[in-house]
């Protein structure tokens, strides 16, 4: 479904060893060592030929089968800025750490009997994921349009790429879409980068521990993770680790 390119940065020799192992494991994926984050991000975006683009971070999981036919591009004919894979009628919690809610707004229509459409502009004054059109957690955008917006501001991490983005730049596309149920979950169990949040409060596991396990052939076993009660875009899930597990 996606033509994948991974922009990565290893801060220690042990992390470099793990990335080397990962690169060998997935030879069909293009891995790009990060230098200048903004410049590298723009170059990666421009290197694609597809009309759309999506961004993911390393704690995103596509947990539900995702099937998109080419006609999904029709959504962009309806003033839609993005197709969100992280939103759906099931994502009723805004923040699992505080318990705040994010009820799906009134739907203005359903495009191609699949894509639920609403005006993010009408609810943008509320602090809710349904009123924020830009995310690095699996939103799909028109590629050339989003590249032109990246030239407007400075960013040096995925968090600042999202956090410093001015949503009013997308006012000319006042609508968002999602499918009935979300397909992607961000499970924040540890913290990468300089931004601070409450990651890892419930099922935290350190980067060092995950990396050490990976180098010892212990892997996250996604088949054993409980995805039965996804209620939030950012929701901690307990990771199940299997050692000496043969991948493919």
What spans do the regions from the language model cover?
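Conserved catalytic core of nucleotide-sugar-dependent glycosyltransferases
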Residues: 67-154
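C-terminal catalytic/acceptor-binding lobe
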Residues: 138, 144, 148-248
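A structural signal for short, well-ordered beta-strand segments and their strand-loop junctions
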Residues: 31, 54-55, 81-86, 140, ...
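Active-site nucleotide-sugar/metal-binding loop of Leloir-type enzymes
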Residues: 42-52
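Acidic donor-binding segment of Leloir-type glycosyltransferases
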Residues: 1-33
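Short beta-strand-to-loop acidic/aromatic patch adjacent to the donor-nucleotide binding site
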Residues: 50-61
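Short beta-strand segments
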Residues: 4-9, 57, 84-87, 180-193
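A short, glycine-/small-residue-rich helix N-cap motif at loop->alpha-helix starts
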Residues: 32-43, 63-64
